[in-house]
Amino acid sequence: MLTPVVSYSTVKEVKGPLLVIERTRGVAYGEIGEVVGPDGEPRRVQVIEVGTDYAVAQVLGGTLGLPAKGSTVRFYGKTLKLPVSEELIGRILDGKGQPRDHMPLPPPEDFRDVNGEPLNPYSREYPEEPIETGISAIDGLYTLVRGQKLPIFSGTGLPHNLMAAQVVRQSTVRGSEEGFAVVFVGVGIKTEEAIFFMDEFRKTGALRRAVAVLNLASDPVAERILAPRVGLTIAEYLAWQLGYHVLVVITDMTNYCEGLRELSSGRGELPGRRGYPGYMYTDLATIYERAGKARGKKGSVTQFPILTMPHDDITHPIPDLTGYITEGQLVLSRSMWGKGIYPPFDVIMSLSRLAKDAIGEGKTREDHKDVANTLISAYSKALELRNLATLVGERNLGWRERRYLRFADAFEQRFIKQGYYERRSFEETLDIGWDVMSILPEDELTNARPQITQKFYRRHIFESIKL
């Protein structure tokens, strides 16, 4: 039980989720406390701005029914710390780290600051080991790497929630003696989405190795800002103290940024691009930069955040700033989804900057780089030929060009498309890749090494296709 250091009855204003407290002395940024209204109910607060004689605090429990007059704020002289334990695996929490599954919290093994402990840049290790998600488009083309931060850029109505649940259920680290865990963070999600995730995790057994932090759209906006930090604090404890490889899946970071804009507006700050605060880049970096590997530590923290692009605009400040901080992006395509292809990846717009160092012999398979480079290059050429075919007609194209059109169809329907409950290993993904690539003549596979093509090319597939 914390003992108050100082109390104030000088609440000037309650503005949205914020309290403005006058005549404060010695109150620190990030300090926690509680506000007690005339009804006697305590609510947790955290200081987010400090002036010469005032402080602004966000109320984590919401300000409904809380008047300025008659309210008392008590500060504890400490920052917000989260009780953590290995026994949190299998639990469902809210955005403040409190139980949402109606069970008591396990005895804490440690208390960790929710703002994290920044990794010394010198102690960081370069990520080089893959995570197998079981999804061919990710594993085959844009491999997720332990310690990487690789976001999904989605849009309203696209199946990013299905993908998040599938990644939580299927992801694994092969050939590692350390444990593997998933921390799932739902930020500002609707009640039906929360029910979907909870039911899915319980039904498939994914919760046995996962911690779920669910912040609902109806929860206070201040909790929305806290939820990703709660999830990452748990992930860091599992990784740095217990040696787990932790995959953190966060959805939806757009809701987080909207909450940030709401708090900024409530504080009367000058808006930046499209009304978002000018410090949004820095704020996002405090979340994304908590991913990584550290020298001397067995574990790792990998981030897989998901955001919905407003109006499918990839130049919007949220995806734009996210792209500057993270190491690539996986973009979902509305046109692919319209064709009935799941997961609907936009292969050309997607990128993983670290994938090249985590694949190949001794990590996945010797032909992995050849397959990835060839598939992307051939598909890019096939899309150009599709556009040409709409102008001149497919029958007016040469036989090689028609092969590319057949390749594009097979690539989308066999390689990219897979079932929601279908899990593919790296080997299965690469074998499907060769099946699809073998539709093309062998001399067209110029992005693959000759010795690799000679070993894996399926000539019988090429010969079986009649144009």
From Swiss-Prot:
Cell compartments where the protein resides: Cell membrane
Quaternary structure note: Has multiple subunits with at least A(3), B(3), C, D, E, F, H, I and proteolipid K(x).
Signal peptide range: none
Biological source species: Pyrobaculum neutrophilum (strain DSM 2338 / JCM 9278 / NBRC 100436 / V24Sta) (Thermoproteus neutrophilus)
GO molecular function, one term: ATP binding
Topological type in the membrane: Peripheral membrane protein
Name the record gives this protein: A-type ATP synthase subunit B
Gene: atpB
Pfam family, one: ATP-synt_ab_N
Chief location: membrane
InterPro entries: ATP-synt_VA_C, ATPase_F1/V1/A1_a/bsu_N, ATPase_F1/V1/A1_a/bsu_nucl-bd, P-loop_NTPase, V-ATPase_su_B/beta
Annotated SUPFAM superfamilies: P-loop containing nucleoside triphosphate hydrolases
Any single GO CC term annotated in Swiss-Prot or TrEMBL for this entry: plasma membrane
Stored HAMAP family: ATP_synth_B_arch
